[in-house]
């Protein structure tokens, strides 16, 4: 007879690890205990030596689906008088617990909520040890029900029995609940008056969406605005009310099959769509509908829900023949027909060849969104603000935007926005890392011997990070730091991470930009706690994030194209070719610099920099195509034109600004309506054409933007189409980035290349440059965002390198 104490750290709380341990111990006829603590999980086993060894081996080989073991320490222990194996109360002590992310319903839970004979039929908060909420409901560790927002919902007898059933998948499932004891929905008017509760609230909300109303929905990590994506009038109404005139809206498809009617879905994209994280996935639209999918075969029939104002009749069905279908949607009084045979509203994603699609990721989505429906599911917050999650605030801010609010009484402890992913060259690329991914840590070997650091990230797409030894824990996407609420959320979430993960930073890492709010906060934090501070150049941190993910120790050429970043020479960078090795960085080449007339306002109004280019190229007599272009500019452009020769302007080598300039010259717009708006539309224009390489000078390690802009204007003079010029611009930039990269690699004997920065979210550019440089080993970020959301990870990695 032997006895052992086993300490396990990693993602071992909130994923069914203790029930797994208990079942395994019973199977091997071991006695003992298992409990959570803030380090992870502590196990005591007692039994035959072979059984104990088998137990330790299977802890690792049979680990639950969403778990991860980082360390496993086995120590000999004293024998005790025990008769069984039990899950005991958790123990609180400072330590190393990791927390799992929120997960979409598992197959077993889905089967229950879709089974009319099951007691959880259509229950919107169904979960088990394999799925459901985690990060958004946890107040503190160890992970027990009384330390979550579920503590106010005592379990009923059947739920308690499930919780205690060793063989069941709800054995010690902390959020376990049913419609008799758990959270419930209520549908309310915007003045707070309750209209309906429970399942009736969900069905009535569905009815109102199908009728053309806008409903605010309290989700897993915050509020969404929901409307029918097939009704253009209501989508336009949503845009008008929210003040979001152009930015593409994400949609939720009721099923994968419904999504396939509107977008192309590869096998990898399908895997991402159906993953437990359930992010929004950017997918290519089907521009021409297959007639077989629009019209069913002759005499075919199908069922639809008939939703009456008397919701007691909600489940009645009606048969409609194919011949009746074309008029059925328009002529039924309630207008509830929602079918994949109808086209998507043009105003959902105007001018876009892609569509952001998410599948149902909470149990209530399966009751709310019909399987054949396509609904707008967009965050209810203002652009750049953090996700809206407070109930009182939601009523205040959504009055005048939403017609109704579908809310529930489970408190959101930690808000999270939807994550966004796109697949490029068969690899999922992270655009926004939030729900479903945070707070899962990223393993970074180089951090193993580093002290705990706080990396503040950047001001755009803000996300900070902390590390515990070799694990980087990134915060959710928070928004842009120009908004006060994001600034407040930064401090709130930083304090929360320190408490939740029991971390106390001993160093602070910030962006070198002296005016970044995040950098100022980091300096204030360091001063408050008397900590050393490390400054990291912005684009070096972009490269560092990829080095952290890929564990690269060799020298690399970092090609970083983004919107802006403070350079070592005091100008703004953003079109960079950097030699990077460990903590060393050297600028080898870059895009040529151009001024930003008016400073920050020129970022929002790209016509200003475009006007500078035009006046440099044609100081006396511009071609007629440019004269016509000037006539399209906002009022007051003549004043700026006269001032240009006398203005002191900051210089920028930004690739993002070059995209904006070309978009303005092509007439796609002169002012950004949302972040990267014009660059995105320029990419969309290029998708339908095959580009040619235009003249662009490459001299003395500088790619000359001026000659490329001249080439663009020459094409306009020749009457080339906007789509063709857009494709030519992309093709040219791809070619010359490749040529400059090859020159740099040859000169410095480099075989590894890193592609990073927000501009490389452009699928054409990223795929093109990867193909152009296929003779090298190419590295791109996949676990952290390509944009500034990944900066904090790079800051952590470089901070650790600078201490070696």
PLM region spans:
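Conserved phosphate-binding/catalytic loops in two-lobed NTP-binding clefts
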Residues: 511, 530-542, 751-753, 763, ...
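Short glycine-rich phosphate-binding loop at a beta-alpha junction
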Residues: 216, 502-514, 533, 749-759
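A phosphate-binding glycine/aspartate-rich beta-alpha loop in the early core of alpha/beta enzymes
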Residues: 76, 214, 222-287, 343
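Conserved phosphate-binding catalytic cores of ATP/NTP-utilizing and phosphoryl-transfer enzymes
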Residues: 260-265, 367, 387-394, 439-450, ...
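Glycine-rich phosphate-binding/hydrolytic loop that grips phosphoryl groups
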Residues: 539-561, 565-567, 606-615, 660, ...
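A contiguous, well-structured pocket-lining segment that forms one wall/lid of small-molecule binding clefts
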Residues: 175, 182-184, 458-496, 614-750, ...
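Intrinsically disordered, low-complexity, mixed-charge
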Residues: 1-175, 179-186
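Internal gly/pro-rich beta-alpha loop/helix module
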Residues: 62, 162, 371-447, 647, ...
């Amino acid at each position: 007879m032997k006895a052992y104490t086993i300490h396990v750290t990693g993602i071992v709380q909130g994923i069914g690890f203790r029930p797994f341990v208990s079942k395994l111990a019973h199977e091997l006829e071991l006695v003992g205990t298992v409990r959570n603590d803030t380090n992870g999980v502590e196990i005591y086993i007692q039994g035959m030596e072979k059984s104990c060894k088998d137990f330790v081996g299977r802890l690792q080989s049979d680990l639950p689906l969403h778990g991860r073991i980082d360390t496993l320490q086995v120590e000999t222990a004293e024998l005790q008088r025990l008769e069984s194996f039990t899950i005991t109360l958790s123990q609180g002590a400072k330590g190393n617990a990791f927390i799992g992310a929120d997960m979409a319903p598992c197959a077993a839970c889905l089967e229950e909520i879709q089974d009319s004979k099951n007691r959880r039929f259509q229950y919107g908060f169904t979960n088990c040890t394999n799925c459901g909420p985690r990060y958004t409901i946890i107040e503190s560790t160890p992970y027990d029900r009384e330390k979550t927002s579920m503590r106010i919902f005592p379990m009923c007898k059947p739920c308690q029995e499930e919780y205690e059933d060793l063989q069941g998948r709800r054995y010690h499932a902390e959020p376990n609940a049913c419609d008799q004891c758990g959270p419930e929905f209520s549908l309310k008017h915007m003045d707070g008056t309750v209209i309906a509760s429970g399942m009736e609230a969900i069905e009535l909300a569905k009815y109102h969406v199908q009728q053309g109303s806008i409903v605010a929905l309290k989700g897993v990590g915050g509020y969404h605005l929901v409307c029918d994506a097939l009704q253009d009038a209501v989508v336009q109404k949503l845009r008008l009310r929210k003040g979001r005139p152009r930015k593409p809206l994400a949609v939720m498809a009721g099923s994968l099959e419904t999504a396939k009617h509107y977008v192309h879905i590869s096998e990898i994209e399908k895997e991402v769509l159906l993953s437990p994280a359930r992010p929004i996935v950017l997918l290519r639209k089907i521009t021409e509908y297959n007639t077989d999918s629009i019209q069913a075969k002759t005499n075919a029939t199908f069922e639809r829900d008939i939703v009456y104002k008397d919701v007691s009749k909600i489940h009645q069905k009606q048969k409609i023949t194919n011949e009746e279908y074309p008029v059925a949607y328009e002529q039924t009084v309630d207008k509830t027909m929602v079918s994949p045979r109808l086209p998507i509203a043009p105003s959902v994603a105007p001018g876009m060849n892609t569509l952001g699609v998410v599948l149902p990721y909470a149990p209530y989505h399966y009751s709310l969104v019909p399987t054949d429906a396509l609904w707008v599911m967009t965050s209810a917050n203002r652009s750049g603000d953090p996700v809206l999650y407070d109930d009182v605030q939601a009523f205040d801010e959504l009055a005048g935007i939403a017609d109704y609010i579908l809310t529930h009484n489970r408190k959101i402890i930690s808000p999270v926005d939807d994550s966004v992913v796109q697949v490029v060259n068969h690899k999922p690329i992270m655009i926004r890392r939030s729900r479903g991914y945070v707070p899962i840590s990223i393993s970074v070997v180089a951090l193993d011997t580093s002290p705990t650091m706080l990396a503040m990230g950047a001001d755009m797409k803000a996300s900070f990070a902390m590390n515990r030894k070799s694990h980087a824990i990134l915060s959710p996407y928070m928004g842009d730091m120009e908004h006060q609420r994001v600034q407040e959320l930064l401090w709130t979430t930083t304090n929360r991470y320190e408490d939740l993960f029991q971390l106390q930073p001993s160093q602070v890492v910030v962006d070198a930009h002296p005016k970044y709010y995040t950098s100022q906060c980091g300096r204030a934090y360091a001063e408050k706690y008397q900590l050393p501070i490390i400054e990291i150049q912005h684009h070096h941190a972009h490269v560092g994030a990829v080095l952290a993910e890929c564990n690269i120790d060799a020298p690399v050429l970092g090609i970083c194209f983004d919107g802006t970043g403070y350079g070592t020479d005091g100008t703004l960078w953003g079109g960079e070719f950097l030699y990077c090795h460990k903590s060393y960085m050297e600028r080898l080449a870059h895009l040529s610099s151009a001024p930003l007339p008016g400073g920050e306002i020129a970022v929002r109004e790209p016509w200003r920099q475009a006007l500078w280019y035009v006046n440099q190229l044609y100081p006396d007599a511009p071609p007629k195509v440019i004269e016509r272009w000037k006539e399209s500019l906002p009022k007051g452009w003549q004043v700026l034109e006269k001032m240009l020769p006398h203005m002191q302007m900051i210089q920028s080598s930004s690739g993002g600004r070059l995209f904006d300039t070309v978009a303005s010259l092509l007439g796609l717009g002169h002012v950004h309506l949302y972040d990267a708006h014009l660059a995105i539309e320029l990419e969309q224009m290029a998708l339908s054409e095959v580009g040619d390489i235009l003249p662009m000078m490459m001299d003395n390690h500088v790619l000359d933007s001026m000659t490329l802009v001249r080439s663009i204007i020459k094409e306009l003079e020749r009457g080339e189409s906007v789509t063709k010029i857009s494709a030519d611009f992309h093709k040219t930039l791809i070619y010359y980035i490749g040529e400059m990269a090859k020159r740099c690699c040859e000169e410095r004997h480099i075989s590894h290349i890193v592609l990073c920065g927000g501009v490389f979210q452009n699928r054409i550019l990223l795929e093109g440059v990867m193909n152009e440089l296929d003779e090298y080993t190419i590295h791109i970020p996949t676990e952290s965002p390509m944009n500034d959301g990944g900066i904090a990870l790079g800051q952590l990695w470089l901070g650790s390198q600078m201490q070696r």
